């Protein structure tokens, strides 16, 4: 009974969104929810149906009393079949373990990204304005600028390709 009340309290949309489930995991969870809802509906319908049979009424109506006696005997001796659900429980536990593992991996990635973004934000906040930087400081921060400049100068080019088209010719001569 506790499992039934716990299952009713699950907010499936919140579970999917708060864990950030996507793709196959979200689809599996939705399929599980659908099976759960279908089973709950069937149990509700069956529990509302009457479960007693008035065999005296059938004895009065039917001429063949042997048939009624046989059916009553089978009804009284009926034992519901029990099913081994351990396989399904193992599958659910494996799904849960996989979902937890995926969530932990995602959590680790998110935390690493947050740390990286925090460092970037600190660098942005503590950085000097661009117009106050020296050429040496820019070259130290981006060594490829020095390499590109050295390459252009060694080829006899004194301006990067497309500079005049973009910024115009600034020469006075």
From Swiss-Prot:
The gene is atp7. Residues 1-23 form a transit peptide. This is ATP synthase subunit d, mitochondrial. F-type ATPases have 2 components, CF(1) - the catalytic core - and CF(0) - the membrane proton channel. In yeast, the dimeric form of ATP synthase consists of 17 polypeptides: alpha, beta, gamma, delta, epsilon, 4 (B), 5 (OSCP), 6 (A), 8, 9 (C), d, E (Tim11), f, g, h, i/j and k. Mitochondrial membrane ATP synthase (F(1)F(0) ATP synthase or Complex V) produces ATP from ADP in the presence of a proton gradient across the membrane which is generated by electron transport complexes of the respiratory chain. F-type ATPases consist of two structural domains, F(1) - containing the extramembraneous catalytic core, and F(0) - containing the membrane proton channel, linked together by a central stalk and a peripheral stalk. During catalysis, ATP synthesis in the catalytic domain of F(1) is coupled via a rotary mechanism of the central stalk subunits to proton translocation. It is found in: Mitochondrion inner membrane. Pfam families: Mt_ATP-synt_D (PF05873). It comes from Aspergillus terreus (strain NIH 2624 / FGSC A1156). One of its GO terms (cellular component) is proton-transporting ATP synthase complex.
């Amino acid at each position: 009974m506790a499992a039934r009340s716990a299952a009713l309290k699950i907010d499936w949309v919140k579970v999917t969104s708060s864990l950030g489930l996507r793709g196959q995991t979200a689809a599996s969870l939705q399929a599980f929810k659908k099976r759960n809802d279908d089973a709950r509906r069937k149990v509700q319908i069956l529990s509302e149906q009457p479960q007693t049979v008035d065999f005296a009424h059938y004895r009065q109506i039917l001429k063949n009393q042997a048939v009624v006696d046989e059916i009553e005997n089978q009804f009284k001796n009926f034992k519901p079949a029990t099913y081994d659900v351990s396989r399904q429980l193992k599958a659910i536990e494996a799904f849960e373990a996989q979902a937890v593992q995926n969530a932990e991996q995602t959590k680790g990635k998110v935390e690493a990204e947050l740390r990286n973004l925090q460092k970037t934000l600190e660098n942005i906040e503590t950085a000097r304005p661009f117009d106050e930087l020296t050429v040496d400081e820019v070259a130290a921060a981006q060594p490829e600028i020095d390499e590109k400049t050295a390459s252009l100068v060694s080829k006899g080019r004194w301006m990067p390709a497309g500079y005049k088209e973009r910024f115009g010719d600034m020469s006075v001569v």
